[in-house]
């Protein structure tokens, strides 16, 4: 229904009053309790100011029943569509809003928790001992003299001492090592973080590498003031559950810190070089590509391992990380620096592969196949496997223990002997037929 009233805003000028304007005034007066009986709606000529007589016009023109209907409609509209009419009231006048009215309260940062502060200190102290290593391949330039460096990958390393020795993984510079470089050849580029936050780049020259333990040593000609050697701790006393920190350059993001705990000890690490490394440290600290060669630290900031691998089915850090224990690093690195290789202790005899030993019903121990003549093993009295007069196989000695350390198979014997040095004397417990014997033998340098 639409109610229209003609009125004059000026003398002799007719205007029409819209429904919304009329409704607004009517509702205002009704809410004040004005009740007047009215004649039927009609067009009324307004001769006075419409602003002052609009209410009187509406009261006289609109019956009480109609007013109640209009009021009810307005009330229901406000209930079901409040945002249409009340948004301005809720939001206020934006023209008078200030920054202080809408800004949240800002609280000061405050001091760090003790655990946070300790981790921050450990990182700030050791981050300068961590370097970024880029493996490079030198290739001849076409139609030009000289060579060009082709970056192959990147990893991490640690400053070993103030003389410029850098320890990293074998596989970090594996592409360069596949060319069989000589000691002193450039096999990578090393970035060292200075105290002012600037990365200094140096040539990484090969000192020595050990594929069996996935370790390598480089040398950089950097000023001693730039070199911050890392402190090496003992890994023999580690406990599962203690906190550890890993620093490295995952995915090229230099000097990244991850925190976790030691989740396992004495693990066999299947390294990227394809060899098995015993005694590994297992951790849940995230170790990604680029972390290899970086340090694993204990809660005191001491090096307890060199990060080397991650077991994952996704190719990311959502898996289990492994580190070469510092006890192994302390044994290998000094030899690489002194001899450019590792002098491994061994017996220098030929042992039967485990599948062959199993076929010969040797279920426990390492079966001796051959013993070189005039060797220390022959002098100690070890017997090889041979054939009898009838062509039957006569089993040689079976090594079942080294200094009371049980030997289950050939791989176990190699792992045990790797703990000794050249010249050490050990006692071998062997089975010879139905006899149990003990033989003393001096370990010699393992032949390649």
Curated annotation (Swiss-Prot):
Subcellular location: Plastid, Chloroplast thylakoid lumen
Keyword Secreted (UniProt): no
Key words, A-Z: Chloroplast, Hydrolase, Plastid, Protease, Serine protease, Thylakoid, Transit peptide
Origin superkingdom: Eukaryota
GO cellular component labels: chloroplast; chloroplast thylakoid; chloroplast thylakoid lumen; plastid; thylakoid; thylakoid lumen
Protein EC: 3.4.21.-
Residue ranges of domain PDZ in the record: 336-433
GO molecular function: peptidase activity; serine-type endopeptidase activity
Residue runs in coiled coils: none
Catalytic residues of the enzyme: 171, 214, 292
GO term, biological process aspect, one: proteolysis
Serine protease: annotated segments: 152-333
Pfam families assigned: PDZ_2 (PF13180), Trypsin_2 (PF13365)
Stretches that traverse the bilayer: none
InterPro entries per record: Chloro_Bact_Ser_Proteases, DEGP1/8_PDZ_dom, PDZ, PDZ_sf, Peptidase_S1_PA, Peptidase_S1_PA_chymotrypsin, Peptidase_S1C
Job of this protein: Probable serine protease.
Family that this chain belongs to: Belongs to the peptidase S1C family.
Protein name: Protease Do-like 8, chloroplastic
UniProt gene name: DEGP8
